[in-house]
Amino acid sequence: MSFGSKVSRALRFLEIPVKDRASVSFLKNPDLQPIKSANQTWGFWSNFAYWGVMSFSVGTWMSASSALGVGLSYPETIGTFIVGDVLTIIFTLANSCPGYDWKVGFTLAQRFVFGIYGSAFGIIIRILMSIVNYGSNAWVGGLCINMILDSWSHHYLHLPNTLSSKVAMTTKELIGFIIFHVLTAFCYLMKPYHMNYILIWSCVATFFSMLGMVIYLAKQAHGVGELFTSTKSTATGSTKAWAWVYMISYWFGSVSPGSTNQSDYSRFGSSNWAIWAGTICALLIPTTLIPVFGVIGASTCDKLYGEQYWMPMDIFNHWLTTNYSAGARAGAFFCGLSFVLSQMSYTISNCGFASGMDLAGLLPKYVDIKRGALFAACVSWACLPWNFYNSSSTFLTVMSSFGVVMTPIISVMICDNFLIRKRQYSITNAFILKGEYYFTKGVNWRAIVAWVCGMTPGLPGIAWEVNNDYFHNTGIVNFFYGDSFFSFLISFFVYWGLCLLFPFKITVKHDDKDYYGAFTDEEARKKGMVPYSEISEEEIRAYTLGEGYTTGHEYRPEGSDDEIPELVKTSSENTNEFEIVHHKNNEKQSSTASEKAA
């Protein structure tokens, strides 16, 4: 057997297995197709929990600790978080539309806007973000694992470190990190849309654990401490105004990856109301409440123990090391269990499954969500996440500023959805190489240019954030502070303007039939589509399995006499006009349609 034959055989072996009515190809696998209507089960609490799990977390508990660094008081910082939440809600809900309109995820939404090949830009960025965030969250999850193990054994609590001093972690931390990874890996055996109950229960458990901690500390300290009143704003005038802008932008930037791929989870929604109400409540209530818990925790610890503990794990470590009582051990165990569940839920939904969905979009023939998630889990070790927390690494600073890169992507997607395509997309064409979304050589250069224009001005600000001594330019720094606002507007209007100046042909507004069973009969008819239940088996196979492929835009079962639209551009260059010529029994009928770019 030749080397080429061996490679081909190995590649065939690596192809993902598929069931009936499913196929894999260069552009398609079952995980990329629209979600079946039967699996769109996420109601209010599921959507609330998806965003709530980000807030009922150790990271959000610690978030207010960044306040003093920019010169704001803690109450002012909570105010910036609330404004940042409103901004996040607007961006997130606007970016939810491809998911709840057409039941597709981030990968297909990228193809709609950036093109079949151009979509790789945003997808790769999201994958890198997911992998790094996976490592970071897994490390914190490992610390939560150690809370449980510490409560079990006094010897484990004082386990000696056997690692070299050159490694920025201890033996205990390594053990917790490994255990967390192993536990998380088993969860990828489930489908993403089955995870909603885990998300809900993790939010409930973590909320009551955090509430119990705050009540206990406040009772012991006879109040909430003095941090809310003793810390004063050191910034004044325009400096204070820009500090507000920075914290708002920072707060949005920390969750911008989730806003970017919101379609991955909005497609699971049972109704638009459930998505909107759940997302709004989750991005307003816990994101405000949990940072307040964190301030109370640090304030009461300062009064009780003479030190501000911002990480819940540090609080329990103090309790266990000073008094290894049954009460302290029980508290560490149950709170540690809820924190582990919270970190697992967040890591799986926002990092593991997210990267799995994205990798499935890059290599759909060989990668499904499960394989992609496991790959991200393995590669996350290469990020050396222990250096993020146990050394002087500036990587977390850079990561918190990554909204500079993500916000322009969100902006272009929103502009295309509302102003250019008017919320109309053809799902079948997202699986065709030279179809509706091929644009220019597979790339929508207008979207790429708009993304670059919105991203580039903020890059010097990231360099300044890493090292303030690089340069001293107030304009660049202030632009970076407000990047979430400025980059969004720049990319939005640049893309809109380019589409007006250089319009592309919108030849297919949406599919005429629900080939994937993504809608109920009533929903399909409202969208002007033939319901799935009324489509023949042969036609479904033609579209979902790729049998009978006949043209660059449509599928047809072989030997069928059904009408096949052949799309022919008209002479107009300034509008998106096209002529649809229907062929049936060698007879032609013509019709003309015109769609403007904006």
Curated annotation (Swiss-Prot):
GO molecular function, one term: thiamine transmembrane transporter activity
Modified residues (Phosphoserine): 560
Extracellular topological domain: 63-73, 133-173, 219-240, 296-332, 393-394, 468-483
Gene3D superfamilies (UniProt xref): Hydantoin permease (1.10.4160.10)
One Pfam family in the UniProt entry: Transp_cyt_pur
UniProt keyword list: Membrane, Phosphoprotein, Transmembrane, Transmembrane helix, Transport
GO cellular component: cell periphery; plasma membrane
Region (Disordered): 574-598
Intervals, Cytoplasmic compartment: 1-41, 95-111, 195-197, 262-274, 354-371, 416-446, 505-598
One of the protein's GO biological processes: nucleobase transport
Protein location: Membrane
Polar residues: bias regions: 588-598
Membrane topology reported for the UniProt record: Multi-pass membrane protein
Transmembrane segments: 42-62, 74-94, 112-132, 174-194, 198-218, 241-261, 275-295, 333-353, 372-392, 395-415, 447-467, 484-504
NCBIfam families recorded: ncs1 (TIGR00800)
Membership in a protein family: Belongs to the purine-cytosine permease (2.A.39) family.
PANTHER family membership: NCS1 FAMILY PURINE/PYRIMIDINE TRANSPORTER (PTHR30618), NICOTINAMIDE RIBOSIDE TRANSPORTER 1-RELATED (PTHR30618:SF15)
Record's protein name: Thiamine transporter
Gene name in the database record: THI7
